[in-house]
Amino acid sequence: MAKKSAENGIYSVSGDEKKGPLIAPGPDGAPAKGDGPVGLGTPGGRLAVPPRETWTRQMDFIMSCVGFAVGLGNVWRFPYLCYKNGGGVFLIPYVLIALVGGIPIFFLEISLGQFMKAGSINVWNICPLFKGLGYASMVIVFYCNTYYIMVLAWGFYYLVKSFTTTLPWATCGHTWNTPDCVEIFRHEDCANASLANLTCDQLADRRSPVIEFWENKVLRLSGGLEVPGALNWEVTLCLLACWVLVYFCVWKGVKSTGKIVYFTATFPYVVLVVLLVRGVLLPGALDGIIYYLKPDWSKLGSPQVWIDAGTQIFFSYAIGLGALTALGSYNRFNNNCYKDAIILALINSGTSFFAGFVVFSILGFMAAEQGVHISKVAESGPGLAFIAYPRAVTLMPVAPLWAALFFFMLLLLGLDSQFVGVEGFITGLLDLLPASYYFRFQREISVALCCALCFVIDLSMVTDGGMYVFQLFDYYSASGTTLLWQAFWECVVVAWVYGADRFMDDIACMIGYRPCPWMKWCWSFFTPLVCMGIFIFNVVYYEPLVYNNTYVYPWWGEAMGWAFALSSMLCVPLHLLGCLLRAKGTMAERWQHLTQPIWGLHHLEYRAQDADVRGLTTLTPVSESSKVVVVESVM
């Protein structure tokens, strides 16, 4: 039976006394009774602990993970990296790093969230000394939520402008065009010098209306970061509309989010298939696909190829952001997260590979139409979405239809990644709030404040100098360097501080069997080595940010970027040092105490079953201000 210490209110349960499920006792020492929330005995009385929300169906979780992890990077970055780094040869380092780095950490984050039933911060109660990992992931995902939505705002703007008989970026003569503007030409026009009586060489020096629409109308690009300029109100309204969409996708929690992603995560695949069918029927499409896949074996020995593969894996798998942990925390305790993680990883990488056929069939057509090499039209990132593809659709029949389809797909790809990222941030935030702070509409108000704060910060990115701010966030705040640092410490903490075998046992408790030993080996050895190797390479061969190969950022702009990066990377060592300095006892005693897990209420039955192995377990009633029941394992 449970015994209460009269002095400190701690309930202890010895291993030989526990039979069956362990129920937290009430204030009189008797088991808590009644239906509804589980009772927690406290010196002041019984405290109701609200149950954690769970997915209505497991497919809701699968769709949410697909929507979050499969995003813009799969469509606009992977195909270009594959072409740039040797075509089909790039798949070799990509698959290898996925096996030793991407999939193991992807599985680690989901299973950790499911086991601890907590968001990105409280999930590190598994090893409280390293709770700084949770704060770091919150910082990174906040930065991502802030700048990532700008791509949606631009995409929404292009989508609205697509509903016209003539696309505004297809012709010159608008107020934003310059005298150097020349409308998009086909190869036969150039050969006949039929455009404004200019030769092909002269045409090459002119500016495309697509570029002028992007730079002069959408971005209203100023001279640099030091020239912010005024707000672009049209794009600002699109940004506001996107944040309103995100709010209503997230405000009711996973019950509503899990339904919305059925559309936002699946419809982009329908559009990709439609665009692929249209693309392969165009002249020159086959040449584009060949350029995409043609192997260049000499590239395999280049370190940059392996660095690009590793960075793409960690970025596209959405590792280190804490959102996967938050999504996993809403799973049933016995859900087979191992199978889910493998399936989701395959979907993610498969989508990247498939998107390459869509992109390069269109680029091959565009290269053939303009009589230029594929390298002249191949773009990555915003250049593909807002320059290369808009230019390509102007050469197609019924151009507005294909433009609208593409930007609608772009909007959906980014939207579910965005609102799941916000969900991950809100989950981590609300898990920290004690029960005494609970009030009606707590979640709705928290989501509104988060969206409003991000929107205010985003206003700096819809000014004339906004693109320079966007590039700072993109290059530093959630770069490969910060994600690799985060992933390295996650593996070290779980495998070497908590214990890889111990965590494998915890997973076996959830799914009924131990995962493949490969996962344990990766967490312990291979993955940390890969992460640290790429991290060191990125630091040693660091190159300052340059926009469009022309604009060099001032020293204070680069310092601002490093401040973004270090604000998350320093969370781990600073939190660790702070905890060790505040604790009492010898350094060994402090380490032992601070690395003891803090268990949640759902662990009681599980821990009770192996108490004879793990020793004494204590149920510690915390203050009434806390809504989390903790169990401290004394080992």
Swiss-Prot record:
It catalyses: creatine(out) + chloride(out) + 2 Na(+)(out) = creatine(in) + chloride(in) + 2 Na(+)(in). Residues 1-60, 109-138, 252-269, 326-341, 416-444, 501-520, 582-635 are cytoplasmic. Changing G26R: Found in a patient with intellectual disability; uncertain significance; no effect on creatine transporter activity. Changing V182M: In CCDS1; benign. The modification Phosphoserine is found at S623. GO terms for cellular component: apical plasma membrane; membrane; plasma membrane. Changing K294Q: In CCDS1; uncertain significance; no effect on creatine transporter activity. It is a multi-pass membrane protein. The keyword Transmembrane helix applies. The modification Phosphothreonine is found at T42, T617, T620. Changing A285P: No effect on creatine transporter activity. Glycosylated. Residues 82-87, 160-230, 291-304, 363-394, 466-479, 542-560 are extracellular. It comes from the Eukaryota. Belongs to the sodium:neurotransmitter symporter (SNF) (TC 2.A.22) family. SLC6A8 subfamily. This is Sodium- and chloride-dependent creatine transporter 1. The gene is SLC6A8.
